[in-house]
Swiss-Prot record:
One of its GO terms (molecular function) is fructose-6-phosphate binding. This is ATP-dependent 6-phosphofructokinase, muscle type. Glycans are attached at S530. It is found in: Cytoplasm. The keyword Nucleotide-binding applies. The modification Phosphoserine is found at S377, S667, S775. It comes from Sus scrofa (Pig). Allosterically activated by ADP, AMP, or fructose 2,6-bisphosphate, and allosterically inhibited by ATP or citrate. The active site is at D166.
């Protein structure tokens, strides 16, 4: 990309004006999107206006439409809800209201509108756009605007961002606010679990979501619920008997509690509502269990946005500004959405149409079609949930393969969830599943035992590694490992862990030349806070670590804001991989994030200090700088702290914080629980097929490259890649992949921190069509 093209982004908005509004129900992460729209808009040279109180503010005008400044969006990232206010507006539904709204925009020269809201808000925006020409004609005839004003504002560009906790909008894998709502729900479920266990109770939890079962479904996966009721898939006619049998079976197997999740719009096959109270009465009457109902209500909309929602809001906000400024009269109104980890632009009305089709299909009781229209991600969640929850473990081991599961590397949140789903899917398939304690060391020493269904009960929400994990690699113990593979008749190996799990896999591949016993299929599930395993864009555990860092940064920023003129330097984990520092920097609103992948010099440090000196002259008198632990062996945290302290004398003082091992701990986030559960299920399904494929002359013999893989999330799909193929893509000295997708987000971090850089800011999301996306491979 040429310097001229880089520079073009900085002048793209000159002479243009953008208005941003939040409409409909609030959602955590909306503020991150508003902040990004304002700052990137200003960066491109445009004027940006807040529209307070949603469409109502657009109709009423006056003080509701105010110009935004860089500082006016400071300290917004960590706040829930929407700072600029939202309202459900009747006036805008009438043409008269839209006429007043058009008048208010034209008078201010605003021709670009960014709407953050649900499907209703976005449909309203599209109607407004299609009527724009007629509205201007009417205003001109009435003498409210001049011909020149009408000419200047001849067309209106509209871009939508989907902000809704329900995740009910077709065309995007995740809407802004969904992940945070799941955080609130899971916090409550975890808290309820302890009291339910104490009293051997059954809890019926009602979650929000209107006519969409996404929150209920993912909650069930993330907490291992006994049953879930969602509107898209009503239960069979005899569901009362099935439910009661399921609950009593769980108790018979030794469980002290039952959790039932109900979506607020849950219905039966005849379209009749299934309420929490109905279910409670049923359980009490038929089983006599002590049963309680908890309706979660508006708690789900509140609280601090999760790291995921802050990053999603920021990325979508940046892309929205670019889509608006690149728009022409012929460009359709679009929605910026997420597919896998890719930002994409989709025609707004195509998405709205599919969303309406879901409602129509459900009203007409075409539930299978409604499920399909929700998309691949929803379908996958449902398939995995059904597998794990609605099957009785077989009494006999019909498949009778023996698969061992182990953890390797450093402990990380979500490992236990992956072990649980691997073990249970294995048992459902009729296999014998063994668990190995303490990684490859335990495999060599024979620390191996058989796992039954109840062995992994309640593991989903527990942090760390219950099996125990070591960084030891297998090479030195091939003799003992081979002996134990024979002794325990291990025919497949599921390795859950970080970079050591991957290098261990490579060593097993090498060892096959000498030891026939090692010729068994194995699969590596990446699980590490560092997110540095080649072959996967995400690792289990990284999201939990990111949220821990974020929470700490919020508290530190609060302290700095109270003290005034203070800069905090925070050291994050990650080895040589800068993922945590970069993403936490984006989520916490850091001024800089130093990482190994982007070499920096003393001049860069000087620029950062000068930038902070300038910042202290504004109303925002605090600074936050993140440093990855191994970003530079000479520019250490102490060095940077000393440099900042010296250079900032009299202007600001500095403090440093090394976060350390708290980043590995804690209860896994909903995203990590869900991701780990799906990865475990996918890995075990692959394993059964691979063992069958490798079965020759009464024994397993697998020596092809594709019998040893890493299961990874790549853009929009879960893929199995042979470890030998990934070798070329790995920087072994620094334990990182040679190419990392998140590096393209670094410019956004710098622009949002007000650096005058000539860098390409957009992710260049192309306009796709929803039909093409549906047939794509979005699997998570």
């Amino acid at each position: 990309m040429t310097h001229e093209e880089h520079h073009a982004a900085k002048s793209l908005g000159v002479g243009k004006a953008i208005a941003v509004l939040t409409s409909g129900g609030d959602a955590q992460g909306m503020n991150a999107a508003v902040r990004a729209v304002v700052r990137v808009g200003i960066y491109t040279g445009a004027r940006v206006f807040f529209v307070h109180e949603g469409y109502q503010g657009l109709v009423d005008g006056g003080d509701n439409i105010r110009e935004a400044t860089w500082e006016s969006v400071s300290m917004m990232l960590q706040l829930g809800g929407t700072v600029i206010g939202s309202a459900r507006c009747k006036d805008f539904r009438e043409r008269e209201g839209r006429l007043r709204a058009a008048h208010n925009l034209v008078k201010r020269g605003i021709t670009n509108l960014c709407v953050i809201g649900g499907d209703g808000s976005l449909t309203g925006a599209d109607t407004f756009r299609s009527e724009w020409g007629d509205l201007l004609n009417d205003l001109q005839k009435a003498g409210k605007i001049t011909a020149e004003e009408a000419n200047k504002s001849s067309y209106l560009n509209i871009v939508g961002l989907v902000g809704s906790i329900d995740n009910d909008f077709c065309g995007t894998d995740m809407t802004i606010g969904t992940d945070s709502a799941l955080h609130r729900i899971i916090e409550i479920v975890d808290a309820i679990t302890t009291t339910a266990q104490s009293h051997q109770r059954t809890f019926v939890l009602e979650v929000m979501g209107r006519h969409c079962g996404y929150l209920a479904l993912v909650t069930s996966l993330s907490c291992g619920a006994d049953w879930v009721f969602i509107p898209e898939c009503p239960p069979d006619d005899a569901w009362e008997e099935h439910l009661c049998r399921r609950l009593s079976e769980t108790r018979t197997r030794g469980s002290r509690l039952n959790i039932i999740i109900v979506a607020e719009g849950a219905i039966d096959k005849n379209g009749q509502l299934i309420t929490s109270e109905n279910i409670k009465d049923l359980v009490v009457k038929r089983l006599g269990y002590d049963t309680r109902v908890t309706v979660l209500g508006h708690v789900q909309r509140g609280g601090t946005p999760s790291a995921f929602d802050r990053i999603l809001g920021s990325r979508m906000g940046v892309e929205a500004v670019m889509a608006l400024l690149e728009g022409t009269p012929d460009t359709p109104a679009c929605v910026v959405s997420l597919s896998g980890n890719q930002a994409v632009r989709l025609p707004l009305m195509e998405c709205v149409q599919v969303t309406k089709d879901v409602t129509k299909a459900m009203n007409e009781k075409r539930f299978d079609e409604a499920m399909k229209l929700r998309g691949r991600s929803f379908m996958n969640n449902w398939e995995v949930y059904k597998l794990l929850a609605h099957v009785r473990p077989p009494v006999t081991k019909s498949g009778s393969y023996t698969v061992a599961v182990m953890n390797v590397g450093a402990p990380t949140a979500g490992m236990n969830a992956a072990v649980r789903s691997t073990v249970r899917i294995g048992l459902i398939q009729g296999n014998r599943v063994l668990v190995v304690h303490d990684g490859f060391e335990g495999l060599a020493k024979g620390q191996i035992e058989e796992a039954g269904w109840s062995y992994v009960g309640g593991w989903t929400g527990q942090g760390g590694s219950k099996l125990g994990t070591k960084r030891t690699l297998p090479k030195k113990s091939f003799e003992q490992i081979s002996a134990n593979i024979t002794k325990f008749n291990i025919q497949g190996l599921v390795i859950i862990g970080g970079f050591e799990a991957y290098t261990g896999g490579l060593e097993l591949m090498e060892g096959r030349k000498q030891y026939d016993e090692l010729c068994i299929p194995f699969v590596v599930i990446p699980a590490t806070v560092s997110n540095n395993v080649p072959g996967s864009d995400f690792s289990v555990g990284a999201d939990t670590a990111l949220n821990t860092i974020c929470m700490t940064c919020d508290r530190i920023k609060q302290s700095a804001a109270g003290t005034k003129r203070r800069v905090f330097i925070i050291e994050t984990m990650g080895g040589y991989c800068g993922y945590l520092a970069t993403m936490a920097g984006l989520a916490a609103g850091a001024d800089a994030a130093y990482i190994f992948e982007e070499p920096f010099t003393i001049r860069d440090l000087q620029v950062n200090v000068e930038h902070l000196v300038q910042k202290m002259k504004t109303t925002v008198k605090r600074g936050l700088v993140l440093r990855n632990e191994k970003c530079n062996e000479n520019y250490t945290t102490d060095f940077i702290f000393n440099l900042y302290s010296e250079e900032g004398k009299g202007i600001f003082d500095s403090r440093k914080n090394v976060l350390g091992h708290m980043q590995q701990g804690g209860s896994p986030t909903p995203l990590d629980r869900n991701f780990a559960t799906k990865m475990g299920a996918k890995a075990m399904n692959w394993m059964s097929g691979k063992i069958k494929e490798s079965y020759r002359n009464g024994r397993i013999f697998a020596n092809t490259p594709d019998s040893g893989c890493v299961l990874g999330m790549r853009k929009r799909a879960l893929v199995f890649q042979p470890v030998t193929e990934l070798k070329e893509q790995t920087d072994f000295e620094h334990r990182i992949p040679k190419e990392q997708w998140w590096l393209k987000l670094r410019p956004i971090l710098k622009i949002l921190a007000k650096y005058e850089i000539d860098l390409d800011t957009s992710e260049h999301a192309h306009l796709e069509h929803i039909t093409r996306k549906r047939s794509g491979e979005a699997t998570i």
